[in-house]
């Protein structure tokens, strides 16, 4: 039987917050000590890293501690955006093996770390395996790490999020049993007799038909459908957005194929990427991804109502995946641009999850980006929620 529990605290005292959250998690799991602890915390707690690490280790009774900073945290009790939120999940079970992972430095070592990961988490003979990663959002390129891991080992499902902060620290933090630092990637590898059900929900709605990039260089798009890229983009702007290009760039994005070979931007097959710059004189769009000529493209808009609808559909897929079973535990990695900034009110994602799936140990965070598989490859997502549900063989 998999034993899991979650707790959260908003206490400004780092030692009290960590102790309170872990104690709540142990109580829910029905254990006196944990095999592993996952912790998400507001960046304000990083200033007292010794208190944070020592409190978690002492109360949980383990050195297997992994986590990162976050702009917000989530449990089944609800969401905390900003403030001094701290959430902890404890795990323990004979059928679930937990291995903490930590690599530093991260910047310019993504390829090497991917190779090391492949050697540390070899293919398992168990029924389930799951790799959760929490890289420093401000350092490194996670897509390179994912590609390196895939090249070395083949497909291994990866979930996670970029460590985040509220903008005041100017740094994100990664946690291990040895301390708190940055320019690193923390992770947790799980294998054993379990199944992991992973689904994603996106917060953007297509506002154009699929198009084709006809001229480009690296991440600069010169032409779409043989017309200047900026001209095509501007033709889609309606109402107030047509008069305010700066505002338009905050809510409109491009969708690019997740699988370049299939080259499809149909529903569920594209990745949302920011438009990071424009050149009005040359009609160029700059996007946060390298592109190629002949690649499909779609324009999408960030939309709260569409996000609710897609969240509902994703949760129904998870209900179908479970087939009447109850999750032993779950992870939810939510984009920091979702939450109250997307819906207008806080707590939507956690409320929808609880309504659809009931009460179970759930921990989540608001990250700088999200990591999840789509098809048989792992990708970096934006404006997305990634829900991972774990069921044991005895579920």
Each model region followed by its residue ranges:
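Small-residue-enriched flexible segments
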Residues: 1-36, 41-50, 55-57, 63-64, ...
